């Protein structure tokens, strides 16, 4: 039984789904998808549970969410292993994901009070109050690259605000979704407050098509996000939060410490095997001998990166991609770029057929035109050379995406210029693109999202503001507007 609906584990009535380790091929999880009828059942359960859950005090909801945080802590090793085995990422990185899930709880509680709590302003004849109310039933679509942390970033603030939820994990990470749901079950959520439906495209389409849905919170690819946006167009009554991908630029200016800059670039481009939405996809490098030296060092260090299994000792920097198909898509993208005129500096290689272990690739595209503006979700970095900083910014902004952007430079003035001109929701200076602060917004503009960033700002899209003018008594004003007569004279 792999679906959690209205407080019970049930068997899916859809197609059989089998999840294997992307490196070893070991079967990790299997179960049936939810069909459309079961998606509808989950929605009805969430709707029935909503009034009581929303009427609980914030403190009562907080107790259950904090209980979940405690369960994450006590089950950290087990959940780390599940995420690592299912995604292919090394144990060390999966452990940081579970830690981020735990830390998200306290941050979300604080964010609720700061961003969506209650405020009261006294007036001469009463008061003006601001409160926030939950939307109702929300669907949460999870991605596969961080199958615990990223859905958690929607689920936790949504529950704290008083919403009820239908959660669909990525079809590529059903085991992680299952494991997290079982911890929520132990946390004692009332039946129907959080429901789990497993499945792929058919399940997702059934979920997003539900009429009795008050909103949808999505993290994933731009293509799927665009489909959801089109599907929900003309329905302003539904909140839609989209956090999508990016064709992210990293600009390398003057560099005092080449190894430090190379380390930052590798952290930006190749961590998580390039499967972070904020990963650097495009590297803009200043022309000249220093740029040449940097590029040579980047290639030399990158070719030492050998992907390994999740439990290898010593631990590798990167593991496998989510699937062999995903790894092959990166290789195909590199071959297409090479055919268009790109100069390969480091060729990506599948270490073994039947696995997703892929080495990083670097290809120079200077002077090549007509390139597709698409995100290649893996360890493939494209390089361009530039002459002036203005040219670098123009090239960096030449994308429909707008998630992250970065600059390596000792000059604050250049960063100030980038802050004014960059088209991105995250703009970093001498920091990896993949770094983020949980107390700052996380999200982008353009094809990267719809201006509803997650992290600290997730509270904003999980509740709507309610304004009130209030007085505990009613009296006739001493001064009336023109034309109003409340005298005792009888009008004849």
Swiss-Prot record:
Coiled coil: none annotated. NAD(+) binds at residues 220-225. GO terms for biological process: arginine catabolic process to glutamate; arginine catabolic process to succinate. GO terms for molecular function: aldehyde dehydrogenase [NAD(P)+] activity; succinylglutamate-semialdehyde dehydrogenase activity. It is an enzyme of class 1 (oxidoreductase). It catalyses: N-succinyl-L-glutamate 5-semialdehyde + NAD(+) + H2O = N-succinyl-L-glutamate + NADH + 2 H(+). InterPro entries: Ald_DH/histidinol_DH (IPR016161), Ald_DH_C (IPR016163), Ald_DH_CS_CYS (IPR016160), Ald_DH_CS_GLU (IPR029510), Ald_DH_N (IPR016162), Aldehyde_DH_dom (IPR015590), SuccinylGlu_semiald_DH_AstD (IPR017649). Its EC number is 1.2.1.71. Pathway: Amino-acid degradation; L-arginine degradation via AST pathway; L-glutamate and succinate from L-arginine: step 4/5. Belongs to the aldehyde dehydrogenase family. AstD subfamily. Catalyzes the NAD-dependent reduction of succinylglutamate semialdehyde into succinylglutamate. This is N-succinylglutamate 5-semialdehyde dehydrogenase. It comes from Escherichia coli O6:K15:H31 (strain 536 / UPEC).
